[in-house]
Amino acid sequence: MISVKKTMVLGFFIVQITQYLVLILVGLLKYYTKMSSHHFVKEGQEPALIVANGQSCSHELLTQIMEWCPYVVALDGAYTRLCELQVFPDLVVGDMDSLRVPSTKRKTQFIQIDNQENTDLEKAIDYLVEKGYKDINVVWATGKRLDHTLNNVVMLAKYPSIKIVIYDNYSKMFVIPKSFSKVYKKGDLISLVPITYCKEITTENLKHPLKKEELQLGKRSGTSNEVSSTGVVKITYNSGLLAII
């Protein structure tokens, strides 16, 4: 009889411990999911959104990102296209050379910046940086003109202290810090793009691991690697600017 009671008590404690472990795991999952969605954006921060004038992303993706970004800036060439989607930005930035203003009662601020040494995207980023933004999401920055796409990617090197994420329908790209970790699923594809010459790159939980290796545009890149198992992927490097897609 005593052994039966001991067994029941032991079973009760096992059930309680299991429940606590489940709660802990759920909490961790929510935490990492939040990190995965916002890419370095700390709790309480609100990133801005820039809509460039490249190929449109899906309306679903656009509206989802807008939920994270209460302040929306459009480049002048994208303004009319946004209005056709019934999306009205808070601000339009550019040299206004390609601006067509549709009839609307929505209040939108227009700022003309004629500096021809910077692209309209750089003008928008510079404006947000001056306003104190440290986290910026960008859509419609790829596709259409190849020169614009390449410039928008290389442009990340100009803002090493700003957390900029470039989205399209298929992927997202951002510069990672010298020590980076994030939860991925087994089989997820990961590409490492050296915006500048990167040294001492070491990875964990990738099918093709790097161990204190170098990546450089035109010589060697780290495209189409694969996550080995569901869990945390770790990447470290000691110099340069390394982006992940």
Regions picked out by a protein language model, each given a short descriptive name:
Residues D168-K178:
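Short, flexible loop segments at boundaries between secondary-structure elements
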Residues I176-I245:
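Long, charged alpha-helical interface segments
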Residues M35-S103:
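N-terminal beta-strand-loop-alpha-helix module at the start
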